Amino acid sequence: MLIIDIKGTEISQQEIEILSHPLVAGLILFSRNFVDKAQLTALIKEIRQKVTKPLLITIDQEGGRVQRFREGFTRLPAMQAFGQLAKHPQEAIIWAKQAGWLMAAEMFALDIDLSFAPVLDLGHKCKAIGDRSFGEKVTQILPIAEGFIDGMREIGMATTGKHFPGHGQVIADSHLETPFDERAKANIFNYDIQPFEYFIAKNKLSAIMPAHVVYTQCDPHPASGSTYWLQQVLRQQLQFKGIIFSDDLGMQGANLMGNFLQRSEQAINAGCDLLLLCNQPEGVIEVLNGLTYQPNKLEQQKYLTLKKRRTIDFQQLASSPRYQQTKQHLEQLHECWLEWQTTH
């Protein structure tokens, strides 16, 4: 089951037909699909009307540098800002919960089902992660990340922990190349995997997205295409029962798995329920034409558990005192974070 993208600010008849394909479960939106709030609202409404099946509409609206919609929306600080700028730990938790709540509320008000969040990678040295991470120490990030998760869950948005089992300790950016993490297995299990294990045990993750990283001391395949990581560790050892998304199979980090069809087959066989394939329209056609895997009815319905279960009116949301106060505070925090970065 694929989650794919569209080219621009309007949707073509061909894109409607592709989104209606039985093997397509959802759509991911990018900045290129956005002009302003009115255009975006109209686009999503048209897609909902013309694609008659339930479609999972998704986005990366984490905050900081990974925020697809900006003009007309709250500028959210990067996740590192909460722990770095807070005067005491409880303040960081409150800020994170505010951000999770507001982000989810704004997306629901657009009729977007979920944002792929939170990032549970540890550390800031990785080019792909950086200040997207809540922090470096497990004990530091758990309460802050939990605040963000609880804010999302208060609205009713499904949570997606990424990038399992941890992308933070490699320098390379998996958008551009396949990173290799050569640390001992014990290091990964005693450090990187801890946030995932913690939130799985508390039943606070609806979904998990594995990394396009090869952990050489554990398995020769990227985690996104690894039976070891997804079946043995995630499903059996950690007892995760939610949805597994692949990370974008169009990324260079997935090149080790072959062409787009081979990548998709490997990810499915490894245990992914839903596959992201972005910025590769020819690749999407290749996969839809070549994939022999046919999900059963139960598997086809599984992703519906991630859809939003409430309707929020943007005007009503924007007029509420809680929203106004939270928006003002988070945008001030965002500016403080930008200033902090210039001096450190």
UniProtKB/Swiss-Prot annotation:
- The EC number on file is 3.2.1.52
Q: What pathway does this protein act in?
A: Cell wall biogenesis; peptidoglycan recycling
Alphabetized Gene3D superfamilies for the sequence: Glycoside hydrolase, family 3, N-terminal domain
Give the residue range of the signal peptide.
none
**Where in the sequence is the active site?**
H175, D247
One GO term in the molecular function aspect is: beta-N-acetylhexosaminidase activity
GO CC terms, sorted:
cytoplasm
Explain the purpose of this protein.
Answer: Plays a role in peptidoglycan recycling by cleaving the terminal beta-1,4-linked N-acetylglucosamine (GlcNAc) from peptide-linked peptidoglycan fragments, giving rise to free GlcNAc, anhydro-N-acetylmuramic acid and anhydro-N-acetylmuramic acid-linked peptides.
Identify this protein by name. Beta-hexosaminidase
Q: What is the lineage of its organism?
A: Bacteria, Pseudomonadati, Pseudomonadota, Gammaproteobacteria, Pasteurellales
Instruction: List the gene name.
Output: nagZ
